[in-house]
Amino acid sequence: MNQTSHRKAKKAVIMTAADSVAIALDDLASGDRVKIRSLLQEIVGELKVSDSVPYGHKLSVKPVAKGAEVIKDGEVIGVASQPISPGQHVHIHNIVSLYVPPPRTKAPKARREP
Amino acid sequence: MHFMGYERPDGSVGIRNHVIIIPSVSCGNEMAARIAEQVPGVKPIFNNHSCSRLKTDNDLATRALVGLGANPNAAAALVVGAGCDTVPASEVADGIARTRKPVDYVDIEKDGSYGKAVEKGVAVARALLAQTAALERKSCNIGNLTLGMKCTSSDTTSIIACNPVVGQATDFIIAHGGSAIFTETTELIGATHILTRRAADESVARTLCRRVEEMRQRIKRAKVDILRSQPNPGNMKGGLSTIEEKSLGGIGKAGTTPIKGVLEWGERPRTKGLFFMDGSANTQIVIVGLAAAGAQIMSLSMGGGVCARLRTSTINTAGGGLPVLPIIKTLSNPQSLPEADYFDVYVGGVVEGRETVAEAGKRLINEIIAVASGKMTKLESFTSPFQEVWEFYSIGPLV
């Protein structure tokens, strides 16, 4: 049996057809095949995941250019801070709010090597 | 569409028929408990309003106390106070009396002593119980309902399931001529652009923005700026990336109709439709504010997580929360399925693709009609040795 093809398809849900992201309903790993379904329970697509995407996080279902709007539930939830391709994890590393500067995150302290 | 409710003299309709005891100030809590102990069936509503507060907060407390008594789920009210209170019991009773429901008050100064005030309170409470016990439910239009809303322990499933499901109920009640109120000003900091698009007119949009900015400035005076603190680390861990995305999830529960107006905390809407109420996101304060604004039924939509595992979360109290505001709890996250029994409606099937939002919405609407007609909520059916002391919204410092 083929070693790669029997990986079970994992699930994600897309809120509206206009959306550029789907929400992972399984923990996804790079290389996983994911079935995208709508809220009406129809399978609307399938794609290959290129990052690890935790349960509840977003993955891109269409290419988004740098600076372009990212759409979820038919609404703009931010813009891409770098180009995003289908199957990628979409989160604070590649989208930013249009209204609020990114949250202050504590920069890790420089570690002195012993 | 109809439910079986209690008609009140002011034309409002209750879904419960409680005789409540309202201490006008926290000093009256013990007296209220003493009276309630001797009159089984009456419901005390303990609160934390005390002296050493500024006028703005005394005004907020007065409106809340009157609003709790005026709430259609109260058939009658007894107000208790000391006599020296910042919010006099007589003033609260006068406010409630405008609804023409039976109301009376006792205080130590007027009645002569603690013992005499309690003794009279017991007699009044018994009389009010007797006077209201015979009231019967009648068929009433859904349009008489005001639904209060809050979401809590939100996670990524909230936007998929519980909030849009609640949105269906909101739209349904408003379509039948009723009202709905959502609140939590803090949650809108940085996200007013999402909500102002829903405003019925320019003035509503402006008021909304002003309220949010006032809240932000109050927080800044405490030397914290939370503009950049959203979404919080927990939200981000759960997959929310921007404030827009977080707010979008929360608004789902408000359905799709325009926002007719912005209410002060505890203020009753003057017309029907969807309203936003200014105030804190603290669950207890939200519950009191909604009840004081006249909501007879409330929806608490929960994602999941540890909060879902607290049986009475997030309203720890004997006999199911604030007596005048039954709460229907909706659970969203399939990972919290073991806790589903603590909830009135489980909508994890929407997340898993076994049920549509419309189907789950219909189940929630049926539950609302059943609870409005007398079915006990999960929270109402739990007994607990603990009694909540309800917190009132305050904006000034304690002095």
Describe each PLM feature range.
Chain A
Residues 2-114:
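N-terminal small-residue-enriched
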